[in-house]
């Protein structure tokens, strides 16, 4: 299996910040300025006070956010203060997904790497990663052509040669400073004691190339030439785009070029499955455009509760309920998005649970679900449900054959979610993914989210669902909803 991963690959500098530390940072900033910026968040970082205000805002509200650092002086401040004492790891959805896939057995993974520096390349897995223009350049043998990257090949001399090839300097490296904070920690906001209501993170992003969705020319050439051999494409990084750039260009041109690129791949390979992963958008206009334009050509879309709430004008469910991770609100919102915009699959991943809505792949089963929802009310003993309501049909209303068939589909999806949850839990707990056996063993050490289990019961009631294994499923229209609690350490 060959998988393309685009577009954002970067370096994450992860630091857990305490209430004491944010209190000290606040003391060094002007009170009125910080309070004004907390009241009206600027959404970007042009000064140290912008950074402190953004961090304090997220810690105060227990929310997550990602703001772009647009001044070099702030980048130097963050790097000098936090980089050496932080956990340095692979960042960017494309980079993280590339490593995960390679470690789980995908034969070839092709990431788009904007800045192939020594540090950046060292963060990739030593398994099955193929760098167009670099891997084949380094070795002329069949091993290089196969794209299988063994960790022993990645010595410093070879990495240095790749670095020189792209004239990369460490000052250009895309670094995302990730500040994790803990629920229940406290800090002083100029005399007001704040208790952090929820664990989350604030990200200060220093990334000039990825914020333009830069595509490495070698990656672009390879993807187009080998499109027929590619099984899937995971695309992300759109949340880093700006509405306008200093050179007068805008995000619209970037989206047009990217959409053209993806359509070119699909033209060469109509079986290519594209997964679109959203992110924390600073601009609602960009979020809207990405959802509408790229959702239409994607096989599946992934997002968290914050991103789902951002799209509330498309689904009409109050954002407050979604942000509280209420399963009924999340389920209604995701169903409305899928049904209104004719999407095949959406996956919502929160800290406490994952929830997906999808159309069954088999035409037979799609018809069965449609017929079930169109049955006369006398037969189903229920009134027709308006769009988005919780009046869903359960398997018990079906005949034995149909029930068994659809239950297998729901069960298969829940098993996929279970493995995904296990991977996420194992990675969060250990920082590693070393194959399926490792994932399953690590998952046994984790506990199901208590909040997730509570929301699962509410899901069953709200959607008239059916429990299956550790999860549950329900029907609405042509769609099946599945939900599963996450695993936490």
Give the ranges of each region predicted by the language model.
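Ribokinase/PfkB-type carbohydrate-kinase core domain
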Residues: 1-488
């Amino acid at each position: 299996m060959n998988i393309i991963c685009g577009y954002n690959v970067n370096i994450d500098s992860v630091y857990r910040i305490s209430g004491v530390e944010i209190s000290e940072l606040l003391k060094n900033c002007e009170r009125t300025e910080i309070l004004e910026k907390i009241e009206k968040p600027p959404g970007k970082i042009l000064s140290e006070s912008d950074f402190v205000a953004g961090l304090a805002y997220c810690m105060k509200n227990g929310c997550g956010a990602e703001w772009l650092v647009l001044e070099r002086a702030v980048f130097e401040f963050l790097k000098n203060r936090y980089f050496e004492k932080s956990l340095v790891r692979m960042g960017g959805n494309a980079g993280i997904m590339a490593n995960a896939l390679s470690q789980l057995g995908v034969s070839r993974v092709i990431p788009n790497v904007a800045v192939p520096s020594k540090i950046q390349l060292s963060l990739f897995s030593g398994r099955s990663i193929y760098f167009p223009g670099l891997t084949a350049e380094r070795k002329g043998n069949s091993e290089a052509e196969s794209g299988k990257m063994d960790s022993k090949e990645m010595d410093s001399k070879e990495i240095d040669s790749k670095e020189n090839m792209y004239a990369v300097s460490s000052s250009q490296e895309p670094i995302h400073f990730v500040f994790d904070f803990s629920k229940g920690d406290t800090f002083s906001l100029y005399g007001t004691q704040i208790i952090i209501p929820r664990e989350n993170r604030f990200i200060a992003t220093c990334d000039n190339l990825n914020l333009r969705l830069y595509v490495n020319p070698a990656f672009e050439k390879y993807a187009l030439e080998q499109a027929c051999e590619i099984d899937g494409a995971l695309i992300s990084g759109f949340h880093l785009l700006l509405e306008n750039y200093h050179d007068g260009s805008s995000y619209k041109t970037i989206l047009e070029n990217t959409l053209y690129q993806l359509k070119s791949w699909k033209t060469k390979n109509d079986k290519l499955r594209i997964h679109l992963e959203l992110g924390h958008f600073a601009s609602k206009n960009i979020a809207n455009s990405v959802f509408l334009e790229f959702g239409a050509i994607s096989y599946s879309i992934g997002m968290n509760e914050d991103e789902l709430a951002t799209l509330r004008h498309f689904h009409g469910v109050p954002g407050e309920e979604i942000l509280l991770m209420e399963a009924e609100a999340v389920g209604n919102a995701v169903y409305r998005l899928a049904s209104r915009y004719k999407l095949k699959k959406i996956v919502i991943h929160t800290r406490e649970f994952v929830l997906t809505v999808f159309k069954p792949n088999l035409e037979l089963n799609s018809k069965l679900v449609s017929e079930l929802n169109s049955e006369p009310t006398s037969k189903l003993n229920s009134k027709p449900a308006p769009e988005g309501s919780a009046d869903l049909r359960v398997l018990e209303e079906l005949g034995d054959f149909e029930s068994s068939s659809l239950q297998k589909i729901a069960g298969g999806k829940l098993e996929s979610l279970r493995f995904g949850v296990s991977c996420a839990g194992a990675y969060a707990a250990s920082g590693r993914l070393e194959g399926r056996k490792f994932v399953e063993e690590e998952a046994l050490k984790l506990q199901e989210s208590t909040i997730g289990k509570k929301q699962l019961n509410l899901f069953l009631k709200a959607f008239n669902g059916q429990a299956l294994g550790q999860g549950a499923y329900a029907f609405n229209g042509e769609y099946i909803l599945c939900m599963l609690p996450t695993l936490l350490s």
